[in-house]
Amino acid sequence: MLYRTLGKTGEKVSAIGLGGYHLGHPPDPADAIQIVHSAIDRGITFMDNSWDYNGGESERRMGVGLRDGLRQKVFLMTKFDGRTKDSTARQINESLQRLQTDHIDLIQYHENIRLEDPDRFFAVDGPLEALLEAKKAGKIRYIGFTGHKDPFVHVRMLELAAQHNFHFDSCQMPLNVMDAHFRSFGHDVLPRLVEQGIAVLGMKSMGDGNVLESGRVTPLECLHYALNLPTSVVITGCERMAILDQAIEAARTFKPMSSAEVSALLAKTKDAAMTGQFEPFKTATQFDSTAQNPNWMR
């Protein structure tokens, strides 16, 4: 397994992160728990989750999977949807209970996708106040944010953070071979994160499978491309053992790509990427869980 440094935190984490959303998919919870155990046995230390995934089932399954001393072997991340101080504090406490832990290593502001989301994060009685109190209490260690819609909203978040003299520890965003051509987080946000020492967490390397439907790239090419960027972690969902095997193989076979190799890969995807067809999470609303469940934010 490859290991990388998580931005300015100095934490060493696996370059492949186990996505939490897909752990809620197997009908039998034991299958999901087996995936968690196998991932740890094979060197994955970064665990991804979110308060809202599958009605909390993803966190509950991961919590069971991290019993018997395994929690101490991983770097645990989850996310929250609250847009107020009270809802954020409540969701942190619920995640701690489900994950069966006394602290979360990294917690992230989920779905920074609307133009007002950055302002709400820094507002009076907003999420940041709850996060700072939770950090002081030892419930969380690091703070980040995520989003999949438009790089402009991430840039706005970074600008507001600078105005408030606040440093984010991480930022999670789509990084894939299609993103390079359309509303590109890689072009517009990634350089700012690297410059500021904010850990880059790549997600949707295969665009929830949509990138593969283009027929232009293979799963390994998708993962290798994301690993070749200055990412600390590439998070990938694994609802079956075969998909975990694929992620492990990508880490095992990864070698830094030459500029010519990157250019050739992007050339294969350019025409397919230009309309956003294979990144529907940027153009459609069905991927915006907080928009579909506004009560989560209150």
Segments from the language model and where they lie:
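Structured C-terminal cap/extension of enzyme domains
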Residues: 30, 38-41, 45, 164, ...
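Short catalytic-loop micro-motif centered on adjacent basic/acidic residues
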Residues: 45-52, 77-79, 141-146, 172-173, ...
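Active-site mouth loops of central-metabolism enzymes
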Residues: 19-30, 77-87, 115-120, 211-217
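Conserved, mostly hydrophobic/aromatic
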Residues: 6, 18, 47, 62, ...
